[in-house]
Amino acid sequence: MPIGVPKVPFRSPGEEDAVWVDVYNRLYRERLLFLGQEVDSEISNQLIGLMVYLSIEDETKDLYLFINSPGGWVIPGVAIYDTMQFVPPDVHTICMGLAASMGSFILVGGEITKRLAFPHARVMIHQPASSFYEAQTGEFVLEAEELLKLRETLTRVYVQRTGNPLWVVSEDMERDVFMSATEAQAHGIVDLVAVENTGDLV
């Protein structure tokens, strides 16, 4: 039986009584954001809106984006990535579970030195698929030229943000490449791997 989104008490500054809000709204107030689904236009717009709002509220406090995503549509994912580069606060990215496809692209887009994976997280990179917009029925299929441009864009970002040579990234993107947290760290996709049962990082 589904439990829905859990609610937690929250007391606004100056208020005597707490009100019940859903757990994600409470965490957003602490600048903790979550991508826990496929990347699509809806979640992309929500995360972009939150990042912009929280940046306006305080441009000096870092943002934290927790990722557990199998990937999704390229353009909404690139929009999240671009917003992360645009907003003044540093955006920490934290991989928990899986960051695959566009999930790994968003993960690598975190502030360099502030990208973390949990010990048993998995990361997967590959080239973009041929679906372009929000249709999976093949209604909107990328022309080969457009697909090539997208692949070049994604490859260039991975090269820039991992420090790996172009030929290494290009070769990896030819197929699905799955990595453990430590392999993702060695690959330059994350900077740190969390240590179990402690607050320390390696």
UniProtKB/Swiss-Prot annotation:
GO molecular function, one term: ATPase binding
Active-site annotation: S101, H126
Top-rank EC class of the record's enzyme: hydrolase
EC numbers on record: 3.4.21.92
Transmembrane helix keyword on record: no
Presence of keyword Hydrolase: yes
Any Gene Ontology biological process: protein quality control for misfolded or incompletely synthesized proteins
Catalytic activity: Hydrolysis of proteins to small peptides in the presence of ATP and magnesium. alpha-casein is the usual test substrate. In the absence of ATP, only oligopeptides shorter than five residues are hydrolyzed (such as succinyl-Leu-Tyr-|-NHMec, and Leu-Tyr-Leu-|-Tyr-Trp, in which cleavage of the -Tyr-|-Leu- and -Tyr-|-Trp bonds also occurs)
Keyword terms of this UniProt record: Chloroplast, Hydrolase, Plastid, Protease, Serine protease
One Pfam family hit: CLP_protease
Location within or outside the cell: Plastid, Chloroplast stroma
Entry GO terms, CC: chloroplast stroma; endopeptidase Clp complex
Quaternary structure annotation from Swiss-Prot or TrEMBL: Component of the chloroplastic Clp protease core complex.
The family this protein is said to belong to: Belongs to the peptidase S14 family.
PANTHER family xrefs: ATP-DEPENDENT CLP PROTEASE PROTEOLYTIC SUBUNIT, CHLOROPLASTIC ATP-DEPENDENT CLP PROTEASE PROTEOLYTIC SUBUNIT 1
Annotated function: Cleaves peptides in various proteins in a process that requires ATP hydrolysis. Has a chymotrypsin-like activity. Plays a major role in the degradation of misfolded proteins.
Name of the protein this chain belongs to: ATP-dependent Clp protease proteolytic subunit
Gene source species: Nandina domestica
